[in-house]
Amino acid sequence: MSSTTQAPEPVYQWTADEAVQFLKEWNFSLGIILLFITIILQFGYTSRSMFIYVVKMIILWLMWPLTIVLCIFNCVYALNNVYLGFSIVFTIVSIVIWIMYFVNSIRLFIRTGSWWSFNPETNNLMCIDMKGTVYVRPIIEDYHTLTATIIRGHLYMQGVKLGTGFSLSDLPAYVTVAKVSHLCTYKRAFLDKVDGVSGFAVYVKSKVGNYRLPSNKPSGADTALLRI
């Protein structure tokens, strides 16, 4: 009996003319998509528009799973062994970083109880207790001082509007910034009134420890800390 061997299927490769033709057909759509993403990433700040910032977070959140899918696709349809090796490495790195993101986000969520813990941009969450309600917002940098401003009843923390109906007397003695591995406590060091309904307070970092925010707080009390 004679055995027949099947010839390997040829690997299709794009030509330069096909690549140019693809860009000509999809150039306008790709340009609009990239322009939209660029505008969102450039102007997506909590101090400007919370809606645009949330859209920015969604785009950033989708980047890693999209990268993992593309890396796996490259592994399945690798052009040669060199491309296959790099694709496997990139896939492993992407999956490991994606898992680390979820682990850190869950740890931060346990510490704060806020869904902002899954913010892909930063692991710093600023927490301020106003009349028993804890406001949590992400901040990009690890600041040595934090500024709370009240303008005619409107509360701003680091330039981000948190709520209305507050006065300078409602500002707590302490503000916290939660991180994955620890929690920073900021003590109020300065308070100044501009007029009867406006003013600001400066908080200075005073303590760092392994704490979490309590789930229940009495109205008007300063934020307490629970060790974990």
UniProtKB/Swiss-Prot annotation:
Per the UniProt entry, what species is this protein from, by scientific name? Murine coronavirus (strain A59) (MHV-A59)
Classification via CDD domains? HCoV-like_M (cd21568)
Return the protein name: Membrane protein
What highest taxon heads this organism's lineage? Viruses
Q: What about PTM?
A: O-linked glycans consist of Gal-GalNAc disaccharides which are modified with up to 2 sialic acid residues (done in recombinantly expressed E1 glycoprotein in SAC(-) cells infected with recombinant vaccinia vector).
| Subcellular location(s) per record | Virion membrane; Host Golgi apparatus membrane
What is the recorded membrane topology of this protein?
Answer: Multi-pass membrane protein
InterPro entries registered for this protein in UniProt: M_CoV, M_HCoV-like
Q: Which sequence ranges are listed under topological domain Virion surface?
A: 2-25, 78-85
Q: Which UniProt keywords apply?
A: Glycoprotein, Host Golgi apparatus, Host membrane, Host-virus interaction, Membrane, Transmembrane, Transmembrane helix, Viral envelope protein, Viral immunoevasion, Viral matrix protein, Virion
Gene Ontology cellular component annotations, sorted alphabetically: host cell Golgi apparatus; host cell Golgi membrane; membrane; viral envelope; virion membrane
Q: Which residues cross the membrane?
A: 26-46, 57-77, 86-106
What gene is this protein translated from? M
